[in-house]
Amino acid sequence: MSKRLYVAYGSNLNIQQMTSRCPGARLYGTGVIENFELQFKGQSHGAYATIAPKDGASVPVAVWEISKRNEQALDRYEGYPSHYFKQDVPVQLDGKEVTAMVYVMNLKMDFGLPAPYYYDVVREGYEDCGLDPAALEQALRESTAQFYGSHWPHQESIFRFESDAEPDEDELEEDDDPDLDEDEPELDETDPFYFSEGMHL
């Protein structure tokens, strides 16, 4: 069975997740892709990781050796070709350069905020692979700034969960109003901007 090298930069850095999705996949090594930056894009409050060209930047990655069946599974998870496209990129890996396939999000997508659970899965993947989390933290800050037009304090509030915190009266009144959700549109899975919950790079 033919094998292919695949670049993970998001939640598929997480070894438990990747081995569950792609049985038999082997961690080939870790390294960087140069002249790209990590970003969070897609849904406004459920964004996923992607990469974009940027001179002088670099993204820490893991390279997996996958089978054709594994690649087909990843295609489904990543919404290929409508949500992500594939391209080959050079990877600097343990003092040598290899070429590997990477998924890149549809360039029409806007910046957004990752869900806390998804961000934690990615962060755990960085730990699994022994990668420096600085690029991940920078991607979160910059994507937040792009989304809000401001800076880090907004994101800190989103990721702070205090069980004893009391909502203010305005929030309680909004939550108690059954009419607020009447005009909320239903998700259409045929829409090219719809993201399935399986998408985790």
Task: Label each PLM-derived region with a short phrase.
Residues 1-201:
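Glycine-aromatic micro-motifs
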